[in-house]
């Protein structure tokens, strides 16, 4: 057990050194219990490009909540950590750092440049691990992986070679998305389309015989030097007689043919289309059909090459302006038509992507996608939370294109293909024997290796590896909806292809962290929040509580410091409650408390408030567990908050003072037992969300770590509807008197007369038996509880279930104001009656809802009607008094 709780909650003091203690105790490693059911999560590996942001904090907090709860529930848990090499992103960061020193990667060469990238990786991996520690993540570092580990690299090579041998990987020359800044190919989903201001440039291409001109339009006039034809529709009567003739390409005066192709739409524009096979995917297809040459007029950095004549060496956008000016001077520019259009931008560098003819490696997706789609109709399907994201996944799989997987980078998994001077190619896991072979210089798309993460980290391709046999498939993946296409989909089809199993049973999809105004956090807006700054001010537990309490599967969360203040205040409340309980504990042990609580629920000792709080605790355990199982952490948090703050702190702890300040030592022991037991259960329920503060408080009264403590379970013996109903009525009575006092500004310290009228004999007896609580909380001069009470003429009236409460305040009561208050009360009951009546008149609800749910609504209707009628009666009485 640790030192006594300090008078004030100080998160920095509570959290300091705690994480290292957990690591030293090895509490995050799997239990190794062969009888326990395995539960595994692989962390979505963060990129080693920099520090973690608030989105990472949210993502990992949700995972930690899940794994900590499962660990406490007795599962053999593994949360496997690791990081992603993030090819293009990391290489860009390192190149940026080198540029600041006046160095390029080409100055260093591949080997020395990669040394620099590894240095970067080591630096930022250490930073990320430090951040994980401050967040309190219960990962097993003995199994930490990196996507460029030798083990994972072996898996990558095997998958590539096997897919190649199965015909699912091929190499070819096609139009791809090209990033001129990173000088690499991009897959379709690495391209972000943005609406930008642009223009259609209309140009005249003169027939070779000079008899007429054909008007064509393009948004990219700088590519005209790659034009190899113009196309017209074969059924277009305007141009039928021109098919087979030539037009002259302006500026360079090159003749190109007029071809007939259905790609040309007679209804669009002039019906004439320039064909540039090396710079447009549609034109590439036309070129293939007509056996046209492919003329590339750009360098890999987005500058024009020597085929662009006088524009050689110019940036593509500068060349665009210059080409248009030249066309105008030659009389070939017809008009410029301004418009807004969608233009692809690189997700990583932000530059405009260039469609470019290039030799690349591709994954053939049709069969792999079909397998993934078919799996969703089996028992082995992946469950999405919320379910709507299954539709997102299926839609993408049904419309997927072949995946370009080669990248013109140095940082990454080098493609396991070799070429020799004879033009031969060898694909294998190991280099070919003999001399004269050169390995393909390209590397694989980062997502290619990430797609293998759930099984490659477990030891695959060794299917006999202990972790692979024990923890794969994994249990749950937690990730954002923004990478369903990039990552989730690819993990599913790769896992099915190579293991025959789904990679995970469940996918919990969360949204994005936004600022208070609902804007996405970004560098350009300057609204990003460093989670470490938040932790420094509020502590990790407060941040984790905010992130979990605001969570609903699939929904975004708005960050605000006001909410962080509320989170800190809640933990401070827990701290103060704990101090009160432990200061009054008098050496009571948890085992002794459990024994006494068992006697309480069996009605051998204790009072009704003890049984009430234990009943409510039991209900809370059930509801929290149920919502955790559905990943509804926000709902679970709301339930916990209400129980801890409202029911336990505001009511039960206050009610116990009636006993703790008395001279009855036997009752004190029972009350202390219920307090300690309930606190212990609360801390266990909270621990997955607030690991640091719960460990600190737990250490005051228990041995060992709360990390390995058992999670609360529903106990049927705790259920006590009689105690629940009675104390809820008691609370309603006390609350009603307090509210009435406040309405007429009668100080709580001033004694008043309280009359409680009830025709319910059981309720009357209950109120009388527990009148000590009523007196303690309402300070009456006189308290009368009876069915024979006659309502005083001038009295504040309130109606609770089963009783009417009158406060004779003749000298203070304004009849007009009391009437207004009662009218407002009447409107409230009318609204409640309308709502429940509407629900009960819905035949579908009555037919389909559970009988107990329908009965609950009927009970509400009866209760509201009673309150409505009583309020009507009281209004009539007050009107009569007013008229008199």
UniProtKB/Swiss-Prot annotation:
Give the Pfam families listed for this entry: Anticodon_1, tRNA-synt_1, Val_tRNA-synt_C
Q: Which UniProt keywords apply?
A: Aminoacyl-tRNA synthetase, ATP-binding, Coiled coil, Cytoplasm, Ligase, Nucleotide-binding, Protein biosynthesis
- The coiled-coil regions, if any, are 809-844
Q: Might you report a single GO cellular component term?
A: cytosol
UniProt superkingdom: Bacteria
EC number(s) recorded for this UniProt protein: 6.1.1.9
Q: What class of enzyme is it?
A: ligase
Q: Name one GO molecular function term.
A: valine-tRNA ligase activity
Q: Which family does it belong to?
A: Belongs to the class-I aminoacyl-tRNA synthetase family. ValS type 1 subfamily.
Instruction: Describe its assembly.
Output: Monomer.
- Domain notes from UniProt: ValRS has two distinct active sites: one for aminoacylation and one for editing. The misactivated threonine is translocated from the active site to the editing site. The C-terminal coiled-coil domain is crucial for aminoacylation activity.
Q: Which HAMAP family match?
A: Val_tRNA_synth_type1 (MF_02004)
Q: What is this protein called?
A: Valine--tRNA ligase
Query: Could you tell me the gene encoding this protein?
Result: valS
